[in-house]
Amino acid sequence: MTGNDHVTYNVAEKRYEMPFGHLMVYANVRKDMNRLYIDYVFAPPELRGTGAAGRFMMQLMDVVRTEKLKAVPICGYAASWLRQHSDYHDLIS
């Protein structure tokens, strides 16, 4: 199962989303000036262990870089993922 290779911002839900078939991986976020606070990353149980959340995080960090933001990982998964991916360390606030 693959994602659509990009995340979109859902204004009503205040989150970034990426569909994987009929399932959705998302991150609840808050923006403050030049920071994106990643409060919670969710992947449905059916997608856990498939790499879907990792692909989502990669796309989300590309958005952070494009929008010239800094990421503040509040969520344990987001913090762990960022620690393991040195190519995104410049984006951590």
Show the residue positions of the predicted features.
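N-terminal first-folded block
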Residues: 1-36
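Acidic/polar N-terminal loop/beta-strand segments that form early-domain functional surfaces
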Residues: 32, 39-41, 74-77
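Generic alpha-helix structural propensity
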Residues: 38, 52-55, 73
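A short, internal acetyl-CoA/4′-phosphopantetheine-binding micro-motif in the GNAT/acyltransferase core
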Residues: 41-48
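Conserved acetyl-CoA-binding loop-helix of GNAT-fold acetyltransferases
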Residues: 49-62
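C-terminal structural segments of small proteins and small subunits
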Residues: 62-93
